Amino acid sequence: MTYISRTMLWQRYLGTRISSTILPVAVRRIHYGGGRLQDPRYVFSKPPTNDPNQSKEGRDGKHFFTPSVNDGTENSTLHNNSRLSESEMSSIANAIAEQKRKRLKRSIITIFSAFVTAVLGYTIGYKVWYLKEQSFIPLYPCSRVRKLSTRDLRRVSVKKIEDISEVRVLERLSQHKMIQEEYGVPLRDSNGKAPHVSDFSVWCEDQDPCVTGLVFEPDSNRQSSHSWYRIPYVFKWRITHRPISISSFIDDVLNWINVSTSDLFEVISPEKVYGSFKYEYPIQGDNHSLHICFLGEMKLDENTTVIYKGKYHVDVKLERIDLLRTENKKLVRYILFKEEDEK
C-alpha cells in the first residue's frame, strides 16, 4: 500500500479546487444540436438559411439592417414593402434638381457681381478718380445709322446740302433722254416752275461697327454741349454711341509692344474712306470714318415724283435717282441714275 503524506493530499485538494474554478472560464464548451457541431463563427448569432420567410434574427449578418435580395427569385416581402413610391422618388429628384439650380444661380450671381465690381472699380475708381481721365464702358452693339446730333448740326449745314443736292439732281435729270422726251428741257413742274425739293432728310452712317455705352468723367464745372447725369463732387456720366475702329485697336496693340504699322506694311487707300473726295479735306474734329447721307423728294406733277439718295462730304455725291409714276392705276419705278452703272 502506497503511503501518501498529508502534504501531497493537501496539494491535490488545492489543485482540484483551482482547476474547478478556472476551467469554466477558460474552456469553451461545444454544444451539439441535431447531431452536428455548431459553427464557431455563429456562437453569438444564428447561421443564415435559404428560407425567404425567415425572421430578421436569423438573417445573414451582412444584411442585418437591410433587406436581402434572393438569388434567382423576386425581392423579398420586406424589400417590396420598403420600396419608395413613384411620387416620393419624383419629390426627391425635384428637390435635388432645385438645389442644383439654386447653387448654379448663386455661382452665376457671384461671378457677375465680381465682374461688375472689377469693371466699375477700374473705370471709375482708377481712371476717373485717380487718373482724372474720361472712361467708356460698352454695353451693347447699335446700328451704324443714327440721327445728326446737336454738335453735328452745328458743323454741318443741312440747308446747304439740300440746295446743292437739288442742283445736282436737276443736272442729272436734264441729261436723261426719257426726261428730255417726256418732260422737256428746261425741266418744269405742273405749275410751269422749276421743281424744288419737297421733302429732305439727313442722317449719319459710321463705317466702323458701333456700340452704345456709358461715358464717365470727373465732376467739374467745365461747360459742355452734352447733357450729363451728375453725382456731385464724384463723377458725371451719360449714354452715348461710339464706333469701334479695328485699325486703331491694332495700332494700339502694336504701339504697346513698340511696333508700328509702318514697320510691317503701308497701305494708302483714300478711296476706301472718302470715295471720290480723296483730294478734299475731311470735316474737322472727326476721328473716325463717318458718312453724312441724305434722301430727297422732288415732285414734277401730281402723278410723278423723283426720289434721290446720296452722301455729303464737302460736296454732294449722288448714289441713285428714281422716278415714280402712276400708270394705269399702278405705281411704276424708273431707275434714272445709279452710281454703280458709271463705274
Curated annotation (Swiss-Prot):
GO terms for cellular component: mitochondrial membrane. It is a single-pass membrane protein. It is found in: Mitochondrion membrane. The chain crosses the membrane at residues 108-130. Belongs to the AIM39 family. Residues 54-63 have a biased composition (Basic and acidic residues). Residues 1-29 form a transit peptide. This is Altered inheritance of mitochondria protein 39, mitochondrial. Residues 41-84 are annotated as: Disordered. Keywords: Membrane, Mitochondrion, Transit peptide, Transmembrane, Transmembrane helix. Residues 67-84 have a biased composition (Polar residues).
